[in-house]
């Protein structure tokens, strides 16, 4: 009998077909708990995307499980210690969506700093020239980008910023000597207070570990420049939504802006304090959604198969 794998990720046809040639696959919606629980008992492998929680409760229902494949980067929904206790390997795709997220961050940045109204039909001269007078953006090579979390994505964001001509300041858990040994472009390592106080644009790239919940709240936001642009394409739980709403409301007149691709929870609750603020833009977690990134994330199935064959996977979380 071939191994049995449950898939809850949006695999491309190529990835799905590749897996189906090797194992028995059941494709399921991650929200269909009843169906999943009925299948866990015979599952040898599990492929997940963003939202399914892999914890002791799930693992206790899956005594045959050998491997969890995360089609993506973040592992905050996977309890790695629980997986170790149950002897379940965890594989993922840490490099798959970096380019997509970096491109998206700069798309958000340019949308916010370089406004560009659309001409969608006939327009009179007064409106046309009014736009030319009033729509004045900020030039990136005159700005300082602060990156908090200088990992794979943060570094690539920094590389693009430097290529454009932005000053780059960063804060990370790793020591400066190690960062400089791994990065070949100019940057300044600063403490968090200095980063907040000097950033024209603050781009957040920390991971979803528990210690990062509400990493940025009232105290941190109060240190920002009043015209700072805050971009979060990392994890929604990093930013205290209530604190951000207060900061945004206080900086409407001074040019403060926030653009969020991630929220806590997703989708946002009906009473989300960020709704209705003119200088806050919310997006539905799209940073990694390119055809290339989705394909590359889906190829986690290769490492799932490797573990099931008793081979060493390419990218293992433990």
Regions found by a protein language model. Give the residues of each.
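An N-terminal-biased, well-structured beta-alpha scaffold segment characteristic
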Residues: 1-91, 217
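Phosphate-coordination loops involved in phosphoryl transfer and adenosine-cofactor binding
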Residues: 2, 65, 141-144, 227
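Rossmann-like adenosine-cofactor binding region
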Residues: 54-57, 173-273
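Phosphate-binding beta-alpha-beta segment of Rossmann-like dinucleotide-binding domains, i.e.
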Residues: 86-88, 94-144, 159
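Glycine-rich Rossmann-fold phosphate-binding loop(s) that bind the pyrophosphate
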Residues: 150-151
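N-terminal Rossmann-fold NAD(P) dinucleotide-binding loop
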Residues: 154-155
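Adenosine-phosphate binding glycine-rich loop
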Residues: 268-269, 277-297, 303
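NAD(P)-dependent dehydrogenase/reductase Rossmann-like domain
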Residues: 295-318
């Amino acid at each position: 009998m071939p191994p049995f794998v449950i898939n809850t990720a949006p695999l491309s046809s190529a990835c799905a077909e590749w897996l189906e040639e090797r194992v028995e696959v059941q494709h399921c919606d991650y929200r269909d708990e009843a169906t999943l629980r009925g299948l866990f008992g015979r599952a040898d492998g599990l492929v997940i995307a963003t939202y399914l929680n892999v914890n002791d409760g799930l693992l206790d229902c899956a005594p045959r499980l050998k491997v969890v494949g995360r089609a993506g980067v973040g592992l905050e929904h996977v309890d790695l210690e629980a997986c170790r206790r149950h002897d379940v390997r965890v594989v993922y795709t840490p490099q798959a969506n970096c380019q997509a997220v970096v491109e998206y961050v700069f798309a958000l940045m340019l949308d916010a700093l370089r406004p560009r109204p659309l001409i969608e039909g006939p327009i009179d001269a007064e409106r046309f020239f009014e736009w030319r007078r009033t729509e004045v953006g900020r030039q990136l090579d005159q700005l300082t980008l602060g990156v908090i979390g200088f990992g794979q994505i943060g570094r690539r964001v920094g590389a693009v910023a430097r290529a454009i001509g932005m000053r780059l300041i960063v804060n990370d858990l790793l020591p400066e000597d190690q960062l400089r040994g791994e990065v070949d472009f100019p940057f300044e390592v600063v403490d968090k207070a200095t980063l907040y106080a000097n950033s024209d644009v603050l781009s957040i790239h920390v991971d979803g570990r528990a210690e990062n919940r509400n990493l940025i709240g009232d105290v941190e936001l109060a240190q920002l420049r009043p015209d700072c642009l805050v971009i979060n394409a990392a994890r929604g739980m990093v930013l205290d939504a209530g604190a951000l709403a207060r900061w945004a409301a206080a900086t409407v007149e001074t040019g403060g802006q926030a653009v969020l691709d991630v929220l806590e929870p997703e989708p946002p609750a009906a009473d989300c304090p960020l709704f209705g603020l003119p200088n806050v833009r919310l997006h539905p977690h799209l940073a990694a959604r390119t055809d290339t990134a989705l394909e590359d994330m889906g190829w986690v199935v290769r490492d799932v198969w490797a573990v099931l064959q008793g081979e060493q996977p390419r990218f293992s979380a433990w």
